[in-house]
Curated annotation (Swiss-Prot):
This is Histone acetyltransferase ESA1. Autoacetylation at Lys-316 is required for proper function. The record marks 358 as: Important for catalytic activity. The ESA1-RPD3 motif is common to ESA1 and RPD3 and is required for ESA1 histone acetyl-transferase (HAT) activity and RPD3 histone deacetylase (HDAC) activity. It comes from Gibberella zeae (strain ATCC MYA-4620 / CBS 123657 / FGSC 9075 / NRRL 31084 / PH-1).
Amino acid sequence: MAGGTPGGEPTVGSGEPRLKSLATPETIKTGCIAWVEKEGQPRRAEILSIKTTKSGKQFYCNFDNFNKRLDEWVPVIRLDFTREVEWPNPEKEKPKDPKAKKAPTVQSKKTQPSKKSQKRPSKREQSTTSEANTPHPWTDFVENQNRQKSASIGPDGDSQARASVDGGETPGGGDEMEVDERETEVKREPAEFSREVEIEKLRTSGSMTQNPTEVSRIRNISKVQFGRFDLYPWYFSPYPEIFSQEDVIFICEFCLSYYGDLKAFTRHRKKCTLQHPPGNELYRNEEISFFEIDGRRQRTWCRNLCLLSKMFLDHKTLYYDVDPFLFYVMTVRTEKGCHMVGYFSKEKESADGYNVACILTMPQYQRKGYGRLLIQFSYELSRIEGKLGSPEKPLSDLGLLSYRQYWSENILEFLMGYNERDEKVTIEAISTALAMTTQDVEHTLQALRMQVYHKSDHKIVIPEKLIEQREKTKLKRKRTVDPTKIQWKPPVFTASSRTWGW
């Protein structure tokens, strides 16, 4: 899971030389770079924050050449104070410009600069400004990801998400522009919003705050006990501030209520009678079940679900109102109940035709094929509705990898069937058969380099490597959804149930 630069270059701290000396638990401060034990090995890490919990001081460390998801709160005992610490450089004061004067409040026509005297921005400035104000199409991101194969393949050969900003890789042109856009948005938007402004700006897209600084917040929860699993969050989640002082918080795996005290949690578990998500069971096959939960009818449960998922989704922003959303939760059945594996949400009435607003597989169940089940189930529902579905854009790094794999496998399987029958096929036919939008089909074909222009005609070519890969994947046992076992009809909602509940 390490996600640093390809050459192993340092990714924490600035390139300027730093003062080095020994430190103590009392003198070390935010911004220092120290040696911290991780997985039994000493690693260079920058201390981003310090807090005091019930067990003592803890330090939030960003490890060198590791993805941001692997940042963690560590106790004092894991810091090596026998080695020198790199101290942060003092901030340089900006030199004052003696020529700078206060601009007059009212400028007369005589003092206004003429058009000739105004400096014309350079081509670089013009292009940067226009690109920053114009969002990049998803196609560029797909092609950019396809070129950066080395950045998406881990040391064990499995696909891993490594954002250049998070992991410290050298960003490409598209990545630089993406960062510039974010910085521009942060400068343009106020740091905080009032409740009224938040409501006005809140986008109905399953995504927990409109504040641009929320995404970059330091993770506030160190450890979560969820059923029989101990989870270590990846990102900040807006739980009550008092929970940040706890070494571990306890979350009921059925009702998703959260507690900071073990005694209170134990008392709750004795009284909690819920053994499955509070909704209608739509699908049951072997050990897998799917439940549909209406955000309007189960507000508390759905809000708790959003808080839980925010710890593992960087850009999830839905929290205030869950009324306009339906939540589809996948569970694994045991003798003790139905344990949540993952979920996806969708708008009751999507103006853009999205069939998924937010999707998550719980960390303890990742890399086991459950993510594919969630994606397949969302498309099966779209097929029953008679619609073409697509996830909300832009996708996260892990989401893009999962969807691209699903799209590739299904499109390839569909095309191989036509090839064996020696029949012609169109993009519209692929889209209708797989309940995918034509845009997603085209993007996938382009990413796989399967769409070519030959003799004044567009053709689809299947490379030999993809055929060989298909034969290998056939040998693997995959989890799939049986469409015949889905007991569901598209729900019909009143106008009030499709809107925000304020």
